[in-house]
């Protein structure tokens, strides 16, 4: 999580590789002269505008495939509709959202899923959630996992606050589902064993701007980092922690493994899927096992080793997404 995160951060990562991927009609749309800007609006209003085919001149044009990269498709797309499904947070955890989003987002999300010619899910866990809400969509849903390899080629930039420190890294916003408070509250038990240990939190404050209790000694909230600083933090952390209670994919876990970090995650299905047997998985409700695993990692080597085989790149995600598009066009 550097300048941004989630689907909004992943869209440019995905679409850049489509140009050299030879993606026929997509390639024709990539010159600046053919890019149409959209009206800027709050998330819920943006979803409604896109569903109604408004807010951009592009909605009046004809395409081979209309790709909804972030949850929503126009209700009558001028071309086959391909929808990328990241998660179901407005339905799974409505209490995390304000009243307007709770009321307005689920309808466009579910309608887009039902009307899409094909669906791309970012994980098997997300496809399982999809089929729970829209069972008839199972045959139409393809899994194309995301990638974390974007930081591999980025030169490291030192994070001065963490220089020569033993630290655990957690990447994510401070919303309830990310469960960062769970780590903050257990940190005094870690510093009882390792007095100089630092919990480095990278990311924005809570979506809802809740008032925060004072953090205990050793907790550092770093806000946003550049890509180079984030890469440095992953590579130099004693351990990366992912205590989230619900994810669509789990990009920080993927990035941590790709950069050789030791990793502890919750037992969330998406987290377990993305990290497999290369991470320690613990229930994120009992602090005892987490304290034991973190203190063990603080006393061990910083690196878990290189990932086996090749690291998945965003070009792989683009290629597999194009394959689904081709099936849609030829079906």
Residue ranges and their predicted role:
Residues 1-331:
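Carbohydrate transferase catalytic cores enriched for Leloir-type hexosyltransferases
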């Amino acid at each position: 999580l550097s300048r941004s995160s989630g689907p909004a951060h992943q869209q440019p990562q995905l679409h850049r590789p489509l140009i050299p991927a030879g993606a026929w009609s997509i390639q024709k749309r990539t010159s600046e002269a053919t890019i149409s800007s959209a009206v800027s609006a709050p998330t819920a209003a943006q979803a409604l505008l896109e569903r109604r085919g408004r807010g951009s001149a592009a909605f009046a044009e004809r395409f081979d495939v209309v790709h909804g990269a972030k949850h929503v498709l126009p209700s009558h797309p001028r071309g086959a509709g391909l929808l990328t499904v990241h998660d179901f947070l407005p339905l799974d955890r409505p209490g995390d959202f304000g009243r307007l989003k709770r009321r307005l987002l689920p309808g466009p999300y579910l309608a887009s899923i039902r009307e899409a010619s094909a669906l791309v899910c970012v994980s098997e866990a997300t496809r399982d959630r999809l089929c729970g809400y829209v069972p008839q969509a199972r045959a139409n849903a393809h899994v194309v996992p995301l990638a974390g390899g974007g930081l591999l080629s980025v030169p490291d930039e030192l994070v001065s606050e963490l220089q020569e420190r033993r630290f655990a890294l957690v990447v994510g916003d401070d919303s309830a589902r990310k469960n960062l408070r769970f780590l903050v509250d257990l940190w005094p038990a870690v510093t009882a064993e390792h007095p100089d240990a630092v919990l480095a939190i990278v990311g924005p404050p809570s979506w809802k701007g809740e008032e925060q209790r004072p953090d205990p000694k050793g907790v550092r909230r770093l806000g946003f980092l550049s890509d180079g600083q984030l890469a440095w933090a992953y590579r130099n952390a004693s351990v990366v922690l992912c205590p989230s209670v619900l994810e669509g994919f789990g990009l920080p876990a993927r990035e941590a493994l790709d950069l050789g970090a030791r990793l502890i995650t919750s037992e969330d299905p998406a987290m377990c899927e993305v990290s497999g047997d290369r991470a320690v998985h613990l229930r994120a409700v009992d602090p005892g096992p987490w304290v034991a695993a973190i203190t063990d990692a603080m006393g061990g080597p910083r690196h878990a080793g290189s990932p086996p085989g090749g690291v998945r790149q965003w070009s792989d995600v683009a290629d597999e997404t194009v394959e689904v598009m081709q099936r849609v066009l030829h079906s």
